[in-house]
Amino acid sequence: QSTTYKYDSSVEMGNLFDLKASGYFYSRLQNPTNDTVAGKITMLEGGVAGMLTSSGQAANFYAVFNIAQAGDHIVSSSAIYGGTYNLFNVTMRKLGIDFTFVSPDADEEEIQAAFKPNTKAVFGETISNPSLDILDIERFAKVAHKNGVPLIVDNTFATPINCRVFDWGVDIVTHSTTKYMEGHASTIGGAIVDSGNFDWTQNDKFPGLTTPDESYHGITYTEAFGKGAYITKATVQLMRDLGSMPSPHDAFLLNVGLESLHLRVARHCENAKKVANYLKSHEKIAWVSYPALENDPQHALAEKYLPNGVCGVISFGVKGGREAAEKFLGNLKVAMIATHVADARTCCLHPASSTHRQLNDEELKAAAQILRDGGLVAFPTETVYGLGGNALDEKA
């Protein structure tokens, strides 16, 4: 827990600032505690290099902005977290980066049609938040690589416990570590991991990595750092200029959560499936979406990419639409209303009026069923007894 580091000589310090030696020169860029925790996540994902950020939003922003600039274009799945959609569709457009959104179940031709000469990456979520659409990773990776660009995937909902996305062709993975990894709603955080498999020098699309960086006396990241080029640039350039580094104490709390990740994820999945089976047969429930259910449209993809479990999130609709959904929330006794997933408590929310509130009526109509039909999300972690039954049976 320190911002500053001592050096034996000015020469040692100079070599650090010139990136000629490894070490630490300010905690806005790197910290030993943070690096240790990032290393654990990198090992979990099977990557070559990783870094922590102060939030999942920061991780997704850095992952894209590290290789894209004004005048560039990104292809993204349309089934992504509302905050990420707003980041891409509003904030990053202000920076001059354009986005085209395609359905997560788009075929290769549809994905290809979204590409432009200035496309720099493809983005998606392993399991979308909150609609639970599963990205056909191999299909998106195939089209991305055919066009000489990387596939970036947010693996927050699946975690590396349930899906090792690099095995399916993903090049860069991001996480909101706030969720399952930290697991106790005690600290915000994010992470980025590089698979080391993408060749940044195969074309001229990534000059930030393959041409000299004058802010470091002309160093070229791909020449100096090889497979570590992408994470090194994000650390020493973006962190230097933009910040977004979590405190060492936040990294410590994340580390505590990581030690029980494999146990908690298994319990999340076990409970979620039990609740999903209960809800699908309840007379007051209009529909249930949970890919582990055999009759779910996403089940085949779940079997392929997530054979050990999906996640602890369920989406469902209460008959009667939004008004009925609000009554259900008001009647909850065990679960709490919260805009968070995957901590030690069971939570429910109405996405259209909370996490996806920024979407307009037209966007909501075009969105997933959970945003149109009074959808709710539950995140069971404790015993499943009484989670929703009392709330559904209340007369209120």
Give the location of each predicted region.
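PLP-dependent enzyme catalytic core of the Aspartate aminotransferase-like
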Residues: 48, 89-90, 98-99, 113, ...
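Active-site-adjacent structural elements in enzyme catalytic cores
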Residues: 361-396
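Glycine-rich beta-alpha junction loops
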Residues: 3-8, 196-197, 258-260, 275, ...
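Conserved N-terminal alpha-helix of the aminotransferase class I/II PLP-enzyme fold
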Residues: 7-61, 83-91
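Conserved PLP-enzyme active-site core in the AAT-like
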Residues: 51-281
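Conserved C-terminal alpha-helix-loop-beta "cap" of PLP-dependent enzymes
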Residues: 284-360, 366
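Glycine-centered tight turns that cap/initiate beta-strands
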Residues: 46, 118, 281-287
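N-terminal glycine-rich anion-binding loops that anchor highly charged ligand groups
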Residues: 2-14, 371-380
